[in-house]
Amino acid sequence: MKKIITPLLACLLIAGCSSAPKTKTETASCSYTQEGLMTATYDLTAENNDITVLSLKMIYDKSMFGDIDFTTITEDMKGVTTKVEIEDTIIATIEMNLKEADPDTLKNLGFDFSNTDMSFDKVVQDMKDQGFDCK
């Protein structure tokens, strides 16, 4: 009996020590609409409650375009991808990989996350408190 239990316990010990901690991935999509002006949708992805990817999609009435400056957005920013579509509406999409993007680059785009609690739960709750519909 001892000969069976000892190898079994050794296997369990090895299996327990070699397992990596699980990464908890969460997502949320939060939208807000100002009738006749714009719709903003934030898509959030988090690992272990830390936001890793933040995507912002803004849809404006074409008449609002004069108030938006997209000249600072370029395609070569590490961790930031952008897309602007102009038809009957203006659709601007900015996706930021917060693990890769340079904080100064984000500041230049108007996204200053320094001294900000970027935990998934906090950001989603703050957005709900500001009137966003989060799913």
What residue spans do the PLM features occupy?
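Positively charged n-region of N-terminal signal peptides that target proteins for export
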Residues: 1-4, 8
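Subset-of-secretome marker
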Residues: 21-135
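C-terminal motif of bacterial Sec signal peptides marking the signal peptidase cleavage site
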Residues: 14-16
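Hydrophobic membrane-targeting and insertion signals
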Residues: 8-9, 19-22
